[in-house]
Amino acid sequence: MMHENTFSPYTVRRLTEGDIPTILKLYESNSEYFRYCPPNPTWASVQEDMLALPPAKTMADKHFIGFFERDALIAVMDLIDRYPDAQTAFIGLFMVDQNRQGRGVGAHIVRRLSDVLRTEGCRRIRLGIIQDNLPARRFWQRLDFQLTGLEFEKEHSAVLEAEKML
């Protein structure tokens, strides 16, 4: 998945602690997201996102990756391999810089990711959508993600599970 040309015209790489200032800037550009999912981002919350893992998973299963246009970070994704089962990839977070939204950047990345995961034998992608975040819900549904009917509570909001069969 990490091949540089896979997401052309964007380059992709694993993000590190040295990228936190840039990631935080991207997070801060998305005030609408943090209205649905408080609190506002901080250095510590970015670190938490970079290290967060679901039960029984290790950092080897986690891909906290950045998508770059030239040298500018334009999107961040937290992808967990084989979760919650061996045929599923789980997107824990996907955020596009506010200034790039509405231009097809996010859709392009998700479509390419779907192609890559399919060729690697993955059968579905699963994620959570904050219930009240209607723009996010529309975005994922346009990309053929369907609500599964499962719902869980996050600290400040209800989250709806959605998945796409590959």
Language-model features, listed with the residues they occupy:
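Terminal substrate-recognition subdomain of acyl/acetyltransferases
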Residues: 2-3, 157-166
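Conserved GNAT acetyl-CoA-binding A-motif
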Residues: 118-128
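Conserved acetyl-CoA-binding loop of GNAT-fold acetyltransferases
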Residues: 141-150
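Acetyl-CoA-dependent GNAT
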Residues: 5-10, 14-20, 25-99, 110-112, ...
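Residues forming the Rossmann-fold NAD(P)(H) cofactor-binding site
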Residues: 107
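Active-site acidic-Proline motif in GNAT/NAT acetyltransferases
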Residues: 97-99, 103, 131-132
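Conserved beta-strand-loop-alpha-helix junction that forms the acyl-donor binding cleft
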Residues: 127-137, 153-158
